[in-house]
């Protein structure tokens, strides 16, 4: 095959891939058209350099890469990617740019910096925060989140913040969300005795077939809830119990956020480790070497509606 024919085939392949993407759910037509135009006008490249995305999952991965590299992300937050594995975690939860995603108690907005821009154009990001009667630290986090969103409309302008009552939570209209995500929060609800109500509210706001994604500090399998809950760690089986009693099915668990260096036995519980480092300079190097906590990563599904059921 001569060089001209090879280039023509490459261009045709790229054009086909771009038009395929244009037909994918959640990808606006103009994006596919722009990609098609680029495919027909870009200068010659070696064939092995051309790796056009050919599926919705490829497109989501490319979008995640772009967002994770975003200049709007705080440097301190970016430094924690090595512990929190945001790309792999969000892919495991099946997050796509065209979905409605509710993040429960986002704190200062570590994941907000990723999710809000990812969902800005074709989806909806909703940050659910507890009503403002809470303690000072929680109020400061929520105020910081409001300021973050207000200061950068280009990335957060379509994000919403909704308040809920932890004792009787409602996160939105029934069956209105594709994903509910929560990161390192369940232990707080267990200590406050609000966890069952929270999981029931997650179930209510999700569409049938929707996913609940949970990440939290993982206790040893043999640990009892009573002995560890004040440490910030939870037995995985207890979190599964909370979810299944609310109506969810455990779809899959992952070791994405595992840390085998975490012994889970510290003077100040999980808060002894980074990023909190409650002990300050005491044994700081030791705890930094351990890294952030060992975490369960659980994907639950709200069962699809059965024939004859209404929602």
Task: Please provide the spans of the model-predicted regions.
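Class I SAM-dependent methyltransferase Rossmann-like catalytic core
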Residues: 64-92, 96
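Conserved class I S-adenosyl-L-methionine
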Residues: 98-107
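A short glycine-rich, Lys/Arg-flanked "PGG" loop and its adjoining helix->strand segment in the class I
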Residues: 116, 195-208
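Helix-to-beta-strand junctions that scaffold the AdoMet/dcAdoMet cofactor pocket
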Residues: 119-120, 189-191, 206-207
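A short, conserved alpha-helix within the catalytic core of class I
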Residues: 166, 188-201
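A short acidic, Gly/Pro-enriched loop at the edge of an enzyme's catalytic core
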Residues: 170-180
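Conserved beta-strand signature within the Rossmann-like core of class I S-adenosyl-L-methionine
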Residues: 209-217
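Core SAM-dependent methyltransferase catalytic element
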Residues: 263-311
